[in-house]
């Protein structure tokens, strides 16, 4: 379970202080799939970075499975980070190696075992229907395929939480729909998914819960 309790945060800009969150409160249950919505600058990416423990709010607490991130011991931070997968809008793949080697590198970078790498890679590529791409290099595949590989990398170690930041922003409608279908498959693996998006085609066709960050004290609500 994730609890956002009285989160306040602001940034200093040339024009002065920009308030991002003012007493933000929300509760996210285990295994939920929710959307973060709001206009540009509303704090969607900032909140994801807070959940990654990359940004500490000015005040308030973020509690994940009973652990307050504000007081997370330094030695435990790498273990916490390994429990989270991240999928961004842009394709952050190693360009000069194969899809397989991109996933292999991700396993080793997060402290995974080389001994189990082949089994993990085979499983996730098959689950996402992209096993035929394993020998291809990023420059040899389409944008939609690159995003699928990035998704495979994000879940290669079966994280407890998957943070997704505008994953359909650079994709055509068909590729966007395919990414959403694959996220549903991943969600069925008992992974909590928190997805930031301003894609109206996604928002308007969902019955999932939404946190609207345009409301400075949002309640988690259901799309009507």
Indicate where each model-derived feature is located.
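Helix-to-loop junction immediately C-terminal to a conserved catalytic motif
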Residues: 52
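Catalytic Walker B motif of ABC-type/P-loop ATPase nucleotide-binding domains
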Residues: 162-165
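Conserved ABC ATPase signature
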Residues: 137-141, 145
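Short coil-to-helix segment of the ABC ATPase nucleotide-binding domain corresponding to the Q-loop/switch region
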Residues: 97-105
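A short, proline-enriched helix->beta-strand linker immediately N-terminal to the Walker B motif
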Residues: 156-160
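Conserved ABC transporter NBD signature motif
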Residues: 60-68
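Hydrophobic anchor residue at the start of the ABC signature
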Residues: 151
């Amino acid at each position: 379970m994730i609890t956002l309790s009285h989160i306040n945060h602001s940034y200093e800009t040339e024009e002065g202080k920009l308030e991002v969150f003012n007493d933000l409160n929300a509760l996210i249950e285990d295994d939920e799939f929710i959307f973060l919505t709001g206009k540009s600058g509303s704090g969607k990416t900032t909140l994801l970075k807070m959940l990654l423990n990359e940004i500490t709010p000015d005040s308030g607490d973020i509690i994940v499975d009973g652990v307050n991130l504000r007081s997370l011991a330094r030695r435990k931070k790498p273990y916490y980070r390994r429990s989270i997968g991240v999928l961004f809008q842009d394709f952050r793949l190693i360009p000069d190696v194969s899809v397989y080697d991109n996933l292999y590198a991700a396993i080793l970078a997060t402290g995974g075992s080389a001994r189990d790498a082949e089994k993990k890679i085979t499983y996730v590529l098959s689950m996402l229907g992209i096993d035929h791409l394993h020998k291809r290099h990023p420059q040899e595949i389409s944008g939609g395929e690159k995003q699928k590989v990035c998704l495979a990398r994000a879940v290669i170690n079966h994280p407890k939480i998957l943070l997704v930041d505008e994953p359909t922003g650079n994709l055509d409608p068909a590729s966007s729909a395919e990414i959403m279908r694959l996220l549903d498959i991943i969600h069925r693996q008992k992974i909590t998914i928190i997805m930031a998006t301003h894609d109206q085609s996604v928002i308007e066709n969902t019955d999932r819960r939404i946190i609207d960050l345009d409301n400075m004290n949002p309640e988690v609500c259901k799309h009507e």
